Regions:
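Interfacial aromatic-anchored transmembrane helix boundaries in multi-pass membrane proteins
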Residues: 84-111
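Cytoplasmic-side transmembrane-helix entry/capping segments in multi-pass membrane proteins
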Residues: 93-103, 122-126, 150-155
Length: 208
């Protein structure tokens, strides 16, 4: 089991660019580009940049598989701002987070490709998603709890983004751009699922 754990850890480091980020940040320190005190911040920033690039590349690749490239970009553009402030379910490791995100995008694009969303389906999905966001957001994590002020700020921003995206979605449907509107609709639906899962995860953690 120790060997398996070591292999998993090594895979996680490779996938999340930990070693490469460390090497680049140390080279900046050696050249005097940054101070030693800024090393950790620089390393984290580089790793986040690599992670964002990897996730974007993965999103585009999945979009190409389904023939829905611009839809994958629009979904991601609508989902990330909401996710940033609403919170929700978080995987225990960066590798799991990557694969869960890839699976979510694949499921969403499969729905866009193969499942029709008539008005009588879209309206209930939107209403349920809105109720869940208004009731649950923000959903914190056990290792990064939010204080009362942060909760108010995050809740306000999540609701504001939700309202703006709702107006954009309605406008797209009004212009008969149903596919684009459905991308935003499914970003809201995906977020509501993550909020519910995150709330369950937090409750389970507190009981453990």
């Amino acid at each position: 089991s120790g060997r398996a754990a070591g292999a998993c850890k090594k895979a996680a480091e490779v996938l999340m660019f930990a070693k490469l980020s460390d090497t680049i940040a140390r080279s900046f320190v050696a050249r005097g580009t940054i101070s030693e005190e800024r090393f950790s911040i620089c390393r984290y920033g580089i790793k986040q940049l690599f992670s964002v690039c990897l996730n974007l590349l993965t999103t585009l690749c999945i979009g190409m598989v389904f023939g829905l490239v611009w839809e994958s970009v629009l979904f991601t553009a609508a989902y990330i701002p909401l996710r940033s402030f609403a919170g929700g379910f978080h995987a225990k490791t960066p590798v799991r987070c990557y694969w869960y995100s890839a699976a979510m995008i694949a499921i969403v694009l499969a729905l866009l490709r193969f499942v029709p969303f008539p008005l009588w389906t879209a309206v209930p999905v939107y209403m349920i998603s809105s109720i869940l966001l208004w009731l649950l957001a923000p959903v914190e994590t056990s290792h990064k709890p939010l204080d009362e002020l942060e909760q108010r700020v995050y809740r306000h921003r999540a609701r504001l983004i939700w309202c703006v995206e709702s107006l954009v979605m309605i406008g797209l449907f009004f212009l008969q751009l149903e596919q684009a509107g459905n991308c935003i609709l499914l970003s809201m639906a995906a977020l509501s699922v993550m909020l519910a899962a995150g709330k369950f995860q937090l409750h389970h953690t507190h009981q453990a």
